[in-house]
């Protein structure tokens, strides 16, 4: 499942944006968003999702359970 950013909790510090290996995080209208189609949960790059690890606000970068889990290409 890709991650999403809870806009109401995001401080727009941008700590997450440069860490995303898939360039899935961008700023739109003053808020940071994760493009679900690009998010791989950092599988194959890191042991844990970098957006969640870098975010200074707990539970702001979270799994978007409404979308299917990322599957690495075979």
From Swiss-Prot:
Cofactor: [4Fe-4S] cluster
InterPro entries reported in the protein's UniProt record: 4Fe4S_Fe-S-bd, 4Fe4S_Fe_S_CS
Gene3D superfamilies assigned: 3.30.70.20
The keyword Electron transport is assigned to this record: yes
Cofactor binding note from Swiss-Prot or TrEMBL: Binds 2 [4Fe-4S] clusters.
Keyword Transcription regulation: no
Protein name (database record): Ferredoxin-like protein in nif region
